[in-house]
């Protein structure tokens, strides 16, 4: 894990994060009848036609299927590396996996959203469009991810990459809703993001006394797999859909025979997604300790056995991205990812470093999050690239694209985004009002099962901490293979009276050390750096530092 950190202060419109894992989502289900799901679930009719008969009509289709780009706009070769701004490897690894998700990338490169977006404040779709466009159009270079991507989430230390990933996906889903806020919740599941990543669970309970059947459905955007007793992803999926007996104290209260009776409960995938996000539950929700074991995962995965209907043909998915955590705890270590470019070549994306890899190396990792896409979808996007232009052959400069953080220059061409992208980033970073933020917080209460660790210390009155870690224990020792960060912030934390300070930079570390003794008896507070007050400028030695504004009381 990187030693030094940067707190990205400021408000973000998508400030509430609810983790959307769905390994056993039964507690969140609302029991409904078979006829209460949409008649045309966004993804089911293409892959599981026989499932559509049980579903009810949608009040409004927010993102019709025909609006998804049918042809690929992605460059065939791999794109840019991402600069680590201090403890942001989890951000970079997650963004690379999303950047190389074909349906999402193609939609972003079409720029259809920015042409119709009427929001005047932060929009995650606009921000992601700008990022993906820059990343894919700057191969061989290193770019700085927009601070708006992590605003309201990053607190200057290691965070959970899966939490950030789903925070971003959920924010993009919410960005599809302006202008459609009065629609029913089924129609909300027809958004562009749900069409790409979403599907439906079916929880079926069968009373063993009267043989009555109750079906409950719930949408999902990712699937969490328990790996404690599993040696492979297939075994974890089998355990997930294994029937459960309800008897004794757990007997089922049947709504048909109106009595408590033994029952059988089964959880299956009712509709499949274009893109599957499978998260391997490697971290304890209480301590954050890691399950350090190898779990095998295939390059091609047939999901037919885990569907509600198994009497049709294979439903094959192919692997296109892997998010990896190196370390023994969620509080330390390092995140990186492997992605499959549209030309078919695998690459390791390790912050600024981009190197060619092989499928053998990809399948040998201790994966944390796996990304699969339907084989038919991948082939369709790959064929469109072949028709458009021939993939560029790997040359010597492509085989090992290494651009370290020390090689970045202030006038590096890749740091200059296209004119449209700059406009989008500027619009996305505008802050929402405090009243609006409070309203959203009231409307989106944190789920009870989401354990939020209380933040000690005092924050400036104009700073809002949107996301807090779910883990209760504090930070542990750093991973021995720590990364060096661009920003060397002092370990000194401001006192209650100095909590309005924006931060201490590397160039002022001496001053911070001299004042450390004066503050050692004061209550510790979080170090807060406002991103907007930092400016990029070179030092005499060629390294990069940042000008800032600091106020003392």
From Swiss-Prot:
Identify one Gene Ontology CC term for this UniProt entry.
cytosol
Top-level class of the enzyme under EC nomenclature: hydrolase
Q: Which reaction does it catalyse?
A: Thiol-dependent hydrolysis of ester, thioester, amide, peptide and isopeptide bonds formed by the C-terminal Gly of ubiquitin (a 76-residue protein attached to proteins as an intracellular targeting signal)
Pfam families linked to this entry: HABP4_PAI-RBP1, UCH
Record-listed E.C. numbers: 3.4.19.12
> In which broad location class does this protein mainly occur, judging by the first location in its UniProt entry?
nucleus
Key word Nucleus present in the record?
A: yes
Q: Which Gene3D superfamilies match?
A: Cysteine proteinases
Under the heading PROSITE patterns, the entry gives:
USP_1, USP_2, USP_3
> What GO terms in the biological process aspect are recorded for it?
protein deubiquitination; proteolysis; regulation of apoptotic process; regulation of protein stability
Query: For this protein, what is any one GO molecular function term?
Result: cysteine-type deubiquitinase activity
Q: Where is the composition biased (Basic residues)?
A: 510-524
Q: Where is the composition biased (Polar residues)?
A: 496-505
Basic and acidic residues bias spans: 382-392, 398-413
Q: What is this protein called?
A: Ubiquitin carboxyl-terminal hydrolase 17-like protein 15
Query: Which organism is this protein's natural source?
Result: Homo sapiens (Human)
